[in-house]
Swiss-Prot record:
One of its GO terms (cellular component) is cytoplasm. Mg(2+) binds at D5, E56. It comes from the Bacteria. It catalyses: apo-[ACP] + CoA = holo-[ACP] + adenosine 3',5'-bisphosphate + H(+). It comes from Campylobacter hominis (strain ATCC BAA-381 / DSM 21671 / CCUG 45161 / LMG 19568 / NCTC 13146 / CH001A). Its EC number is 2.7.8.7. Its main location: cytoplasm. This is Holo-[acyl-carrier-protein] synthase. Transfers the 4'-phosphopantetheine moiety from coenzyme A to a Ser of acyl-carrier-protein. Belongs to the P-Pant transferase superfamily. AcpS family. GO terms for molecular function: holo-[acyl-carrier-protein] synthase activity; magnesium ion binding.
Amino acid sequence: MIGIDIVSISRISKIYTKFGDKFLDKILSGNEQNSVLNLNYNLKLERLAGIYAAKEAFAKALGVGISADFGFLDVEILKNDRGAPFLEIAPCIIKKFNIKNADVSITHDGGFAISAVILEMSKF
């Protein structure tokens, strides 16, 4: 299954300005919050938009959206040693949706963050 999402960085800026840490607590795990903690403001907004888009793309790949079946904190978008994003999925989500493999890509351009997620799920 494939999920794709695009989000305006200015939209994330408005939400973050209005709600601050409450917004971060709603969409980011502790590890994700630590990953953006010391970034300058513009880079932080870009990273937040990328994470948000990746989580929305993940939900779309599951076919459920953000819902009772899947929430923002059920997957973490982290970076490996080379700076490439990867998914850390809650074990209950892996089991519930029979996820065997997951890949994510995030890009930023022209004031937008775009993400694609590919999930390989078994039928049983």
